[in-house]
């Protein structure tokens, strides 16, 4: 019975620990074998960790590329073509407008600074969490109300019912706020608008 138990233990050790001889071993030899197994595992561990680290870095890079590609595909305006896909580098630099400007259709889009006064075209509403869309050479009809934008945003075909053509004006709207602007102005001059720059890719 004891021999059968020893044989069973030897078989378990040979399958799950490391290769040991088929013959029965004394406790001293078993301790020595356990130490060898531990040393082998310690040697294998840095390689396994290195492989896992490389695999994790590859997975993280792939996820970052996917996220960046998704962000680039979202349109900022129904009248403008969506921006070209940025390079798939994970080190893309994002910049915010400071200060944030709004402006009519004669004002160029881009990153607004105190030196280059450009109308921000990456606006996002912090209240309804919608991207702000713009329509050049249009203004909002005075009959617009909150429910109209709530129900029709961002479908241009439904929104155009309350858009009127007017040269030089740019119509801005999110799901909860709207405004028509003719000249360059600071966003802070419009306290009712809860809009912020949603970052530009440089």
Curated annotation (Swiss-Prot):
One of its GO terms (biological process) is photoreceptor cell morphogenesis. Disulfide bonds: none annotated. Pfam families: RMP. Residues 71-90 are annotated as: Disordered. This is Cilia- and flagella-associated protein 418. Residues 74-90 have a biased composition (Polar residues). Disruption phenotype: Results in the cardinal features of Bardet-Biedl syndrome, including defects to the ciliated Kupffer's vesicle, delayed retrograde melanosome transport and impaired visual behavior. One of its GO terms (cellular component) is cytosol. It comes from Danio rerio (Zebrafish). May be involved in photoreceptor outer segment disk morphogenesis. The gene is cfap418. InterPro entries: CFAP418. Ubiquitously expressed during early development and in adult tissues including the eye, brain, heart and kidney.
């Amino acid at each position: 019975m004891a021999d059968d138990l020893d044989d069973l233990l030897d078989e378990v050790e040979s399958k799950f620990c490391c290769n040991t001889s088929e013959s029965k071993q004394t406790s001293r030899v078993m301790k020595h074998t356990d130490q060898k197994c531990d040393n082998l595992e310690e040697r294998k561990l840095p390689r396994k960790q290195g492989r896992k680290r490389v695999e994790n870095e590859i997975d993280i890079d792939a996820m970052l590329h996917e996220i960046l590609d998704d962000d680039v595909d979202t349109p900022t305006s129904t009248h403008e073509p969506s921006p070209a896909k940025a390079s798939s580098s994970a080190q893309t630099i994002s910049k915010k407008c400071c200060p944030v400007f709004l402006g009519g259709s004669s004002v160029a889009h881009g990153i607004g600074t105190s030196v280059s006064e450009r109308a921000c075209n990456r606006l996002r509403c912090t209240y309804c969490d919608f991207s702000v869309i713009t329509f050049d050479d249009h203004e909002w009809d005075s009959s617009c109300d909150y429910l109209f934008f709530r129900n029709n945003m961002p479908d241009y075909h439904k929104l155009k019912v309350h858009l009127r053509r007017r040269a030089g004006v740019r119509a801005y709207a999110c799901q909860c706020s709207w405004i028509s602007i003719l000249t360059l102005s600071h966003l802070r001059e419009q306290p009712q608008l809860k809009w912020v720059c949603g970052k530009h890719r440089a």
